[in-house]
Amino acid sequence: GMGLVPLFSRWGTRTDMFDATQGLNGSDSIGAIMALGRMAMGVVFFLILMVATHKVTTFKKLKLTPAIALGGLMIGMSLACYVTSTLMTTVANAVMFIYTGPVICVLLARIFRKEPMSPLQWVCLCIVFVGMLFGESLLGFGVGGNAFGLDFNLAPSTPEFPQKMVGDIFGLLSGVFYGASMFFNGYRKDADTTARGVYNFIFAVIGAGTVAILMNVVGMATGQTNWITEIHFTAFNWVGAVLLWIVCGPIALGCLLVAGRNLPAMDYSTIAYWEVPVALFIGLVVFSEPVTLNTAIGIILIVGGGAFPTIKAMIQGSKMEKQQKVAEHLSERLEEEAAKEEER
């Protein structure tokens, strides 16, 4: 779901979905507004799910803790900052910054929760991070005009991106908030997923809305009219926007919430990079973006490095299921034996 963001965001905001030079059908704050829509749709869907599954009472009994609130607040602010960043700086920088999030999550979990992490898990995380750099053409052969180089430009301003430094700051914030959200989602594993999801998305709306409001306030105060929200969507744009809000909102972020609740931070963070190959596949199939040697290497590294925690989780799940069946069978046998003893 998260890997489909480039498809639906381009569909929902661009004047021409396949031509970035045509610009956007809105102002620079449109990214925060799109993130706000994703979170608002999440609230609607999880409220419907809560009523449909008869968990209103569970929601009322669930104690709202800082971890639940901050998990939602952080993801809302992260995605609002990320989409805004892609409009003000290079896509390479924006992607590089937000994908520091899983690494930040792992470090926070190691420091504050003392989660054990094996050398193999660290190796897998490093592999998928390097794979992300290759996949996004930030690192690799022929990058930056070199035989082998790194493309990471920290210039405060360029002719193409006059507000580049601001965009880089938004990108850095998106990574910090993303990592913090993943970290906070690892708490309160006892909380019902549906009930927690309602709270998460409510606070995510607050987070994304805060970024959108601040951009408008700063825009009006400094005279940067391009920061003041303007929307000129066509019917075609609205279809893409709604698909973004649904598929990349309650569906994708709901799965992210479930993963954070059930997986250790290291496995959670490693698997999070799998959205990169999905985005690259969308770029190839829909936008005819070429698959270079670097992107191929990136996909192989991400899939290979991410396979370990995925397979491990599947094996553990299978073992737990077998143990549960054995326990149930043993319990039935004991009950049968007890019944026979009573008959005697």
Where are these regions (language model features)?
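Helix-helix packing/entry segments at the starts of transmembrane helices
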Residues: G37, L79-A80, A94-T100, N185-I206, ...
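C-terminal transmembrane-helix exit sites in multi-pass transporters
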Residues: G101-V123, L133, P277-A296
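Glycine-/small-residue-enriched transmembrane alpha-helix faces in small-molecule transporters
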Residues: G1-L36, L73, M77, C81, ...
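Hydrophobic/small/kink-forming positions within alpha-helical transmembrane segments
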Residues: G3, L7, A40, G72, ...
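Hydrophobic transmembrane alpha-helices of multi-pass small-molecule transport proteins
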Residues: F46, M50, M117-P156, N294-A313
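Specific transmembrane alpha-helical segments of multi-pass solute transporters/efflux pumps
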Residues: G1-F8, T53-N93, I98, F134, ...
